[in-house]
Amino acid sequence: MRRYEVMIILDPTLDERTVAPSLEQFLSVVRNEGGSVEKVDVWGKRRLAYDIGKNSEGIYAVIDLTAKPSTVHELDRQLNLTEAVLRTKVLRPEIH
């Protein structure tokens, strides 16, 4: 199992109160494969550095999790298939 940090930028037209519950659907993939979700941090609506699909804003969410590489690959695949997700970025944080 490895630690990952996943940043997700969602469509700004979504209601910010529904972001965390909708992310839980995707995170069930991690839990079902034996991984764990340490933290879900919804930053809210932020201005983008450049437009993504005619959107100048996006709802940012950062998730810290521990899972197998194959599980994180499946999570990223499912997120990219969702129309409400503008961008994803999966990082492996450095261990200090």
UniProtKB/Swiss-Prot annotation:
GO cellular component assignments: cytoplasm; ribonucleoprotein complex; ribosome
InterPro entries tied to this protein: Ribosomal_bS6, Ribosomal_bS6_sf, Ribosomal_S6_plastid/chlpt, Transl_elong_EF1B/ribsomal_bS6
GO molecular function ontology, one term from the record: small ribosomal subunit rRNA binding
Keyword rRNA processing annotated: no
Assigned keywords, A-Z: Ribonucleoprotein, Ribosomal protein, RNA-binding, rRNA-binding
Organism superkingdom: Bacteria
Coiled-coil zones: none
GO BP term, example: translation
Family: Belongs to the bacterial ribosomal protein bS6 family.
Protein role: Binds together with bS18 to 16S ribosomal RNA.
Name this protein carries in UniProt: Small ribosomal subunit protein bS6
Protein's organism: Thermobifida fusca (strain YX)
